[in-house]
Amino acid sequence: MTLFPVLNNTPVGKQVDSIYESRLDQFLSEGQYRDFNLPSVYDHARIDNPSGDVNNDLSKGFVDLKVYRVPDLSRPSFNEVVGHKKFDETASKGDTFGPSWATFWFEVHIRLPKSWAKYEQVIFQWNCDNEGLVYSQDGVPLQAFSGSERTDFILPDSWKTTEDTFYIEMACNGMFGTGAGSQIAPPDPNRYFTLTKADLVAPNLPAMALAYDFLLMQQCVKQLPSNCWQKYKARQICNDIMNTFHPNDLSTINECRNLAKAFLGNDIDSEAVFEKNNDKANVFAIGHCHIDTAWLWPFAETRRKIVRSWATQMNIMDRYPEYQFVCSQALQYLWLKEDHPDVFEKLKEYVNQNKFIPIGGSWVEHDTNIPNGESLIRQFLLGQHFFEKEFGVRCRTFWLPDTFGYSSQIPQICRLCGMDRFLTQKLSWNNINSFPTSTFNWVALDGSQVICHMPPANTYTADTNVNDVLHSIDQHKNLVNDQAGLLVFGIGDGGGGPTPEMLEKLRRCKGIANTVGYLPNVKLGNTVDEFFDGILKRTNAGQTLPSWNGELYFEFHRGTYTTQAELKKLMRKVEIALHDAEYVSTLASIFSKDYSYPKESLQDLWRDTLLCQFHDVLPGSCIEMVYKDAIPIMSKVLKNTEALLWQAIEQLGFKKASSSDNKEQLCLLNTLPWNVRGVITETEENKLVYFESCDGKGILTAAHTSLKHPAAAYQKDDNFILVNDHLRVTIAPNGLILSLFDLHKEREILDLKSGKNHAGANQYVLFEDTPLSWQAWDTEVFSLEKYEVLDKGKVSIKESGPLRASVVVDIPISELSHMKATISLEGYNDCSEFTGVNFTCEVDWHESCKFLKVEFPVDIHSEFASYETQFGITKRPTHYNTSWDVAKFEVCHQKFADYSDFTYGVSVLNDCKYGFSTHGNLMRLSLLRSPKQPDAHADMGKHTIRYAVYPHSKPLDSSTVRAAHKFNSNFRLLTRASDTANLDIFDAFQLVGEPNVILSHIKMAEKGKSIILRVYESLGGKSRARLVIKSLTVASVTKCNGLEEDLEELCTLKSNDYYEVPIELRAFEIATFKVNL
């Protein structure tokens, strides 16, 4: 007998999809129907009037707040405040606290009603829309508050039956600073924060669990496609829950949760949900807390963000056994150790349990465009050594989710420093082209590779909603190669990290996948390294993955190559000074018995240098407060580095020259690893002296005031002429260069007939710079269409030779800004010397949203220009054939850019600039920007900029590489302190062979008394050379990795008074050698 009725007396209509879906919004809403829906029963009880209405007997005395106002903008510690300062003011909800960056300490005394002992959990709820940290009575950091994102502090069970006191440190800034009107606007110095919550709450935990159940099913309703049956099942269950729930009958909460099990399963209230179908997992979730070491807040605030974030994460780990968390940046761990050693020791326990996982291997999450190659290696040398020393961990994954482009040699440097995996996601921000793959092999200039994964959810701060899990697969760009995605979740940038709500949502996402399917199978409990291990296993050790060769160019934030020019210039100076100090200190430690290598002092200087290479600091995208810290830090580093250098110089028998010194004793220190044929410098009497050395020593001793090939300056008709035996420069009365003529090749170097610029070279152009967003970060392609040519200069002769000939061009920029450019040409003795046109610009800059550049139209045609990048050359197109080419309208470089054809080329050298473009016949160096957010005064003031044009009668070769090094070197004027000053010691380490092989750095080893020599091939060809070591007794020479660990012992050939070590490098290889004495 059938159960199907004969008669139909209960008609059922088809649900109207839009209405039934929209209805669901009511159930969790705090809006007009709150009293009829779930939010009405979130609390069993609440005491919400601390220190308030004395007539309110319920709240009286249960929560008492007293506050200590720190009188300035300092950030005193718990021990400096509690027990030493008076909490003599009462505080209440509705009170305001400020101004911006102020600190307040609260003493919170609570007394729970006896009737609350029955409740499973009691929380203290706090919200002042700023950041705070709870301390126990004995000063242990417990948990952070961060405005609406984190307001609940679960009271320990021991507090539920007693009175207790705890403390809250309040920082008067939001998670993202105190921007006036928008997040990235300059900070509002007078922002105040209102205390809106200081409540004791007994939460209804089943009701909260039902809220998560309903939320995740509602997300499925909204986000699953219309042809998916799970979408409609979720909607029906949600409607059934709304029909079942009654605010006056709490038993209906459990009934509703039972309804939800048909969609979510039975295991979502514990970690057991993740024990099913693990072999089918294709989304691997990992908690993360990205803390910018500085950005919209200063370094000092970051130190507090670290303890707030990490103490909170350890708290969450205790509640969710399946939870694992990664965090990078060795410096931040060091700061925690210095500021909160007790928390650091506790953190170590979680590291040992594989719950809190150090990752990244670097000192900070650094920029990779601006720092030089040695800096990139030092990031890992210091970072990996710290992680190994403190945790016994060597990181295998370079974790850099949020920086503004990725240098072409990063894979090689990673492999040299113990890492073969790389994670980022920033390229998802590209504003022109979509990067084609999510999982791939990234290949460096030399062929070294790392496996790279870009989380397909396109964020490192996922909220663990249904969409985040879906996008971890459906936005994966190459599922044909691998079908797994990493989901990196947690509040980030300003710290914070995952919340309990995120873990609850992940449990339910897993429950959905287990029960009804469709959602990707998410897994918690795998490390990032295990995730990469899985990829390698599934792809035949990566061999079936696509590859990407060379730089990962970021099609956004191109203005960061130029913004905050003073810090960038200091960074260049410091990197070179550290090179010099380590080199001379190494010599002094070997050859002077009374000298010890200043290892700790140099390491401290490197730490500060690497700090300021953080990916918002050095690129120029921080608030002004950060640069008021960073510029003095770098200035102090430069001063102290120079002091160490001079101490080492004095140990070697030399001293700084003075006007009273015997001129016969004057000499120059050359820290370059090759002979320098000529350097013109000024003595204390402002006299020019030409130094040269022909014997390969590191000291230039032959001084001249007359030359075989002098330079001259004169006026011819209305034009001005600079000339030596190699070049003739013709300058118009307005300062533009009309002709740059190679006298040896009888060739005009400039092209003023084609292209945009027909007026002349060294043409300064002021572009309107109004990007679509992110002022300090961005410059856009359309800015190239709106500009003003600065052609109203006035020229006068400054020097007429013979050592140097020069003119000065006085150029108005606007009513507010002005510049003075000196164009000079030097004489020389030997035809092999560098001969180029030098430019020194002194700019008084007071513009708004303008971009100053200088242009050189040259008679060269090639499809590609070459740019020096770290340890190599990166070629970029000079045309706009494709959108990928258009995107590179502004690119980053180091010391030079070169435009060459088969027979001739022009290099533009610089001493502190990083932005460049070469298109058509126009080479353009970026000089200064003037964004107004987030630093309203970025780059305002005086700047000195040096650059040079270096023509060469052949394609790009080692002469340009060496000229750029020479242009950036600081040749210090010395005098011999005694007759015992030994010149031979500067000849102790030489590299002999093909000139494209560069000895880039000499230092003492981190451990022991060995000497480290860093060598790289600079132009892109397999090459041979010989390390020559003189005046020393060598036990052995080994090739080692970037962490200075031996790889292989090399053949060492001994002659009468020196040792030779033959070496062979592949194209663009970076090699490190250890000389064991």
From Swiss-Prot:
One GO biological process term: mannose metabolic process
Q: Which reaction does it catalyse?
A: Hydrolysis of terminal, non-reducing alpha-D-mannose residues in alpha-D-mannosides
- Annotated GO MF terms: alpha-mannosidase activity; carbohydrate binding; mannosyl-oligosaccharide 1,3-alpha-mannosidase activity; mannosyl-oligosaccharide 1,6-alpha-mannosidase activity; metal ion binding
Q: Which UniProt keywords apply?
A: Cytoplasm, Glycosidase, Hydrolase, Metal-binding, Vacuole, Zinc
Q: What is its main location?
A: cytoplasm
Q: In the record, which residues are listed under signal peptide?
A: none
Q: Where in the cell is it found?
A: Cytoplasm; Vacuole
**GO cellular component labels:** cytosol; fungal-type vacuole lumen; fungal-type vacuole membrane
Q: What's the Enzyme Commission number for this chain? A: 3.2.1.24
Residues annotated as binding Zn(2+)? H290, D292, D402, H615
- What protein is this chain from? Alpha-mannosidase
Native source species: Schizosaccharomyces pombe (strain 972 / ATCC 24843) (Fission yeast)
